[in-house]
Amino acid sequence: MSDFEQLFAGKLPKLIMFDLDGTLVDSVPDLAVAVDTMLAELGRPTAGLESVRAWVGNGAPVLVRRALANNLDHSGVDEALAERGLDIFMRAYAEKHEFTVVYPGVRETLKWLQKMGVEMALITNKPERFVAPLLDEMKLGRFFRWIIGGDTMPQKKPDPAALFFVMKMAGVPASQSLFVGDSRSDVQAAKAAGVACVALSYGYNHGRPIAEENPAMVIDDLRRLIPGCLDLDAEILLPDIKRPSSRESIVVVTRKLWMKVIKALARWRWRA
């Protein structure tokens, strides 16, 4: 029995929400360059690739604080120093993404899902200002109907607010939705939203095997998600999906738009 058959009784979900860093793209090399630039400018030892790989996943402010602490525990970092470090990091990271790469199988799988009429959204903790340019550089933006950054809404993952928002906008219930990510925050957000979560084994989870977070399924290649995803004649039952005559506009959710719908989502507010 295939992965999707296990989760959705032989059908495709109507909506799939994806994380970005560590799920679709490996961005750690560029993040590490920006972190080391920040540390060097502050007169501190550089961190290096593997340390940064263990620190990413909770947004830029947390990454900067962890780098300043040289530890996952950043509770003792001075607030003024953290703000200064964040400004330097944001400036350095905005300059280029020359070392970021798309993981194998990602484009093929997204193309297949798009052909099958599955709605797709991107929900990331990466600051909003970096998301669209990176997607354009990687040629991934056209696959997503909704794109939400880490500072787009008042909450970020593991809070499930963004998942609830996308499901409401898509008109798709949690039972017909899937979240695909690579970290504890992704799994927790999906569980809190009542959505099945498939996790990638190759991503960023602070050095812990993602299986320890108990997602519904762990895979090592996105192409494993769908049987025959490279075979456009694969026989998979599809839900009743209204296919647009032409691809509808991508909706990049911004903070301004979010404030217009926050009241509608209030009843779903997650409480830890």
Curated annotation (Swiss-Prot):
Cofactor(s) required, per the database record: Mg(2+)
E.C. designation(s): 3.1.3.18
Pathway(s) per entry: Organic acid metabolism; glycolate biosynthesis; glycolate from 2-phosphoglycolate: step 1/1
A Pfam entry, by short name: HAD_2
Catalytic activity: 2-phosphoglycolate + H2O = glycolate + phosphate
Record-listed Mg(2+) binding positions: 19, 21, 182
Coiled coil feature spans: none
NCBIfam families in the record: HAD-SF-IA-v1, HAD-SF-IA-v3, PGP_bact, PRK13222.1-2, PRK13223.1
Recorded family membership: Belongs to the HAD-like hydrolase superfamily. CbbY/CbbZ/Gph/YieH family.
Protein name per the record: Phosphoglycolate phosphatase
